[in-house]
């Protein structure tokens, strides 16, 4: 870039933040999550927040189901090979639902149409609010699924989508950005 174009560029003010509508796809992170679920033989996943990781988890659980479904029958597991997704933004929950449905329909046309090998995915919308936990400010989802996961993935909520304030404190303030 030349000097003139650099000088015409508007800079952010000190307290200004760049907000992004969608997040960058991190293939290395997704692969690491996929491998973790496979290598550790996870059967029930609780995911806070949704996205491409939801699709990756569903595929890893499907692979584990195909390999270990007979072994898991011997365990005390009420939700084997289920993915529970808790999301506080309906928009992202719907995007994830469509993405998984589209992927599954493409898989069905390519391979067999055996629905028994698919894992059950439970989508739950829940508001997220500020709360006081043992004298500390925290955020909590108002609704949680009834499950006993062997893997919990925390990828939400967006700190700017938290409802309520405690003593006028909220994580939604830009200065609270980690």
Regions found by a protein language model. Name each.
Residues 42-51:
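Conserved class I S-adenosyl-L-methionine
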Residues 52-71:
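Conserved SAM-binding loop of SAM-dependent methyltransferases across substrates and taxa
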Residues 128, 133, 151, 157-178:
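C-terminal substrate-binding/active-site "lid" region of AdoMet-derived donor-dependent transferases
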Residues 94-147:
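S-adenosyl-L-methionine
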Residues 7-40:
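Class I SAM-dependent methyltransferase Rossmann-like catalytic core
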Residues 42, 148-150:
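Local beta-strand N-terminus motif with an aromatic residue
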Residues 84-89:
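Conserved acidic E/D residue at the C-terminus of a beta-strand in Rossmann-like folds
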Residues 44, 80-82:
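Residues at the starts of beta-strands that form the adenosine-phosphate
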């Amino acid at each position: 870039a030349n000097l003139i174009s650099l000088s015409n560029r508007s800079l952010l003010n000190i307290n200004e933040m760049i907000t992004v509508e969608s997040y960058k796809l991190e293939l290395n992170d997704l692969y690491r999550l996929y491998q973790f679920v496979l290598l550790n033989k996870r059967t029930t996943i609780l995911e806070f927040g949704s996205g491409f990781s939801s699709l990756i988890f569903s595929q890893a659980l499907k692979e584990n189901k195909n390999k270990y479904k007979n072994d898991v029958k011997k365990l005390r597991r009420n939700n084997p090979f289920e993915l529970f997704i808790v999301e506080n933004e309906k928009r992202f929950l719907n995007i994830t639902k469509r993405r998984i449905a589209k992927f599954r329909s493409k898989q069905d046309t390519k391979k067999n149409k055996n629905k028994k090998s698919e894992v059950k995915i439970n989508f739950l919308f829940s508001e997220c609010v500020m709360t006081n936990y043992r004298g500390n400010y925290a955020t909590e989802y108002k609704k949680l699924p009834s499950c006993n996961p062997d893997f919990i993935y925390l990828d939400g909520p967006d700190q700017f989508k938290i409802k309520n304030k405690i003593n006028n404190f909220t994580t939604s303030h830009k200065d609270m950005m980690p």
